[in-house]
């Protein structure tokens, strides 16, 4: 475990073509709501949720990035400092599936190889699917990514996506702290680890934690109860 007065915060970016359900996904996860009306994200939206993972307090900061090319310059700036990524395509949108590799390259170009999952959303619309199951599975295998099929509308496997990424990042963080204990004792707190024993702090990314931008945050020391998702995972290792 990390030290008692330390809080973990993870910046996750959710990327993919427009209209694949990125905004709906983080709305569902953070607020428990689903809105079927599509509104194009202009630039970047942000939501957060605090959870517990293996008895550790973890704050997830979810950045929903626009899927249109005209916002590329804006959204790329928000990739910086990301520690995990959700790559999303839609069951009913062939173009979004074919664009996955391009989105992956954009993220890697900005932040390197961070914990990432591939998500096929809208599986409640399988009757209208434009992608064969074996195609999606082959893409996940080629990119060497964990693969989830989700339905934001039915709240299927949404929690599992973010829980998996949080667990993967915690593993990485603990390994880094084991190699360099000073990560938890530096005078400037980092996105990734916060000292919550004082007042409000600023979170600054370190080179080892992918970034160099500063984001002001107010750590929350309240512990949350573990959430149980009634759906079983349909992920592919």
UniProtKB/Swiss-Prot annotation:
Residues carrying Cysteine methyl ester: 234
BP term (GO), one: negative regulation of protein import into nucleus
Swiss-Prot/TrEMBL cofactor(s): Mg(2+)
Record motif Switch 1, residues: 28-46
Highest taxon listed in the record's lineage: Eukaryota
Entry keyword set: Cell membrane, Craniosynostosis, Cytoplasm, Cytoplasmic vesicle, Developmental protein, Disease variant, Endosome, GTP-binding, Hydrolase, Lipoprotein, Magnesium, Membrane, Metal-binding, Methylation, Nucleotide-binding, Phosphoprotein, Prenylation, Protein transport, Transport
EC top class, as a word: hydrolase
Biased segments, Polar residues type: 188-208
Family statement drawn from the similarity comment of this UniProt entry: Belongs to the small GTPase superfamily. Rab family.
Function noted in UniProt: The small GTPases Rab are key regulators of intracellular membrane trafficking, from the formation of transport vesicles to their fusion with membranes. Rabs cycle between an inactive GDP-bound form and an active GTP-bound form that is able to recruit to membranes different set of downstream effectors directly responsible for vesicle formation, movement, tethering and fusion. Together with SUFU, prevents nuclear import of GLI1, and thereby inhibits GLI1 transcription factor activity. Regulates GLI1 in differentiating chondrocytes.
Free-text note on domains in this protein's UniProt record: Switch 1, switch 2 and the interswitch regions are characteristic of Rab GTPases and mediate the interactions with Rab downstream effectors. The switch regions undergo conformational changes upon nucleotide binding which drives interaction with specific sets of effector proteins, with most effectors only binding to GTP-bound Rab.
Name of the protein described by the UniProt record: Ras-related protein Rab-23
């Amino acid at each position: 475990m990390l030290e008692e007065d330390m809080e973990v915060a993870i910046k996750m970016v959710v990327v993919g073509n427009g209209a694949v359900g990125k905004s709906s996904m983080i709305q569902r996860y953070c607020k428990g709501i689903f809105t079927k009306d599509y509104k194009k994200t202009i630039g970047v939206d942000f939501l957060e949720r605090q959870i517990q993972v293996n008895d550790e307090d973890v704050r997830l900061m979810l950045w929903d990035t626009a899927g249109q090319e005209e916002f590329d310059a804006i959204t790329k700036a928000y990739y910086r400092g990301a520690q995990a990524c959700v790559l999303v395509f839609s069951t009913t949108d062939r173009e979004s599936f074919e664009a996955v590799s391009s989105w992956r390259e954009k993220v890697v170009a900005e932040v390197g190889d961070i914990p990432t999952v591939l998500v096929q959303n809208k599986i409640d619309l399988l009757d209208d699917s434009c992608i064969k199951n074996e195609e999606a599975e082959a893409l996940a295998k080629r990119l060497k990514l964990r693969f989830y099929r989700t339905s934001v509308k039915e709240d299927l496997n949404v929690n599992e996506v973010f829980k998996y990424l949080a667990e993967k990042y915690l593993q990485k963080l603990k390994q880094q702290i084991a190699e360099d204990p000073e990560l938890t004792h530096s005078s400037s707190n980092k996105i990734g680890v916060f000292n919550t024993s004082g007042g409000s702090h600023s979170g600054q990314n370190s080179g080892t934690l992918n970034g160099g931008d500063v984001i002001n945050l107010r750590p929350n020391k309240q512990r949350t109860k573990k959430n149980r998702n009634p759906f079983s995972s349909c992920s592919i290792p």
